[in-house]
Structures are given as structure tokens and as C-alpha cells.
């Protein structure tokens, strides 16, 4: 699955392609959209060096079918006091799900065939995208858009 920069970049690419009306709903809540781009991956950063209930929840969410989250998210968006804020987060999460779902089969196949770890593939993919975009992977803060 892609890592931080790939999700950030994909979300930015998607945002500019959305219809103007939808983009205008998201833009005031861009930090929520940006947070949604990382889906449950954000839970992996909580006490990252040890297993705990938060990162286990992140792993469990990755194992569930997307409909579990999206059914709940639809209810939240429909009942939220600020529908556009909830929508911004949910649409960011949709981007996360779409990119993971597309890339995951390739990553898993490459992992099986090469012996390279899932994390190594994610890291190198992010590094390739960073270099392609003119950034130094060693110095670029990939999570600078998350507030």
C-alpha cells in the first residue's frame, strides 16, 4: 500500500479533478480532507514501536471491507451539524481507500516474489514520487500537510 507522500499526492491530484461545486465544499475544510487521505494509517503512529489498541485498530480497519467504514461515514455525513466538514474527511478517506485498493495487489505480489518487505516497497515508492516531484526524500517532511 502507498505511504504518506503517495496518499498526499494522490489526494491533491484528485481534488483538482473534482467538480467545482464539490471542491468548494472541501476547500474550507482542507485539513480534514488531508487527514482523511491517510485513513487508518494515522493510527500506526501512536506509540509506533509497540503494539497497542490504537495501532491494532488501524490494522483491523485495513482488514475490513470498505463498506464497513463507508456505511458509518455516510450516516455521520448525513447527521453532522457541519456536513461539509464531515464530507471533506470522508472524501479524503475515499481517496485513501481507492489508492490502497489499487496498489495493494501489486505490493503483495511483489512482496511474495521478491522477499522485499511491504514497508520497504512503500518507502521506495514514496521516495520515487518525492524525487520525481523535485524533493529530497531525506529532508522533506511528508506529513507537513496534517495539522
Question: Where is each model-derived feature located?
Answer:
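Short active-site segment of divalent metal-dependent hydrolases/proteases
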Residues: 95, 99
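Short alpha-helical catalytic segment bearing the HExxH-like zincin motif
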Residues: 89, 93
